[in-house]
Amino acid sequence: MSTLSLKYVALGDSSGVGVGGRPGGYVEYLFQRLRRTRDGVGLLNLAVSGATSATVLSGQLARAQRTSPQVVTLGVGINDLWRGVTPGEFESNMDRLASGLVSTGARVVVSNLPDMSLAPVARLAAHFLPLPLIVERIGAFNAALERVITRHGLLGVDLYAPSHVELPAGNFFSADGFHPSDAGYQRMAEHFWPVLQRACEAAPERPRATG
């Protein structure tokens, strides 16, 4: 006999690892909330601290595909932003990621980037990445993400608009001024949650063997 389960796979960077806060970051908050609302939920969290769109593509995508996920979250781009990846390279990587994830039949949820020019670390880094350039790059990266979301029929999470209120708040960031605190990860999860719910409702049913 079989029973239906929900297989959730998360891809991304340190925000899915929980650097600066509780292990698992926003992904763990989402998983625990899913477990409270659904039976038989499983999580495979593939997020790696320091990941870029290129390393998610090379190191996480194939593992995600092998699991036949039903819902996927993908949060990546901040490290691309800081490391000089061009918007065109980022968009190309995200296109390939989206195509590979959609091919599994899963419903795919992707977040855009918050306004990291408001992060404390941005002011410390201004000597090599001036604030106006950070703002310009965030706009270009988010425009690229919007195009990828539209092309592949993904579900988008807006972290950018609320970041103008949330990031200046005193408790959003951990002590390093770059990674979120527990409170920051909770806020991220709140923005993901309604979109993840929609993804779950539209997710393909896949039987899980039991007994």
Predicted regions and their residues:
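Active-site-proximal substrate-binding core of FAD-dependent oxidoreductases
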Residues: 55
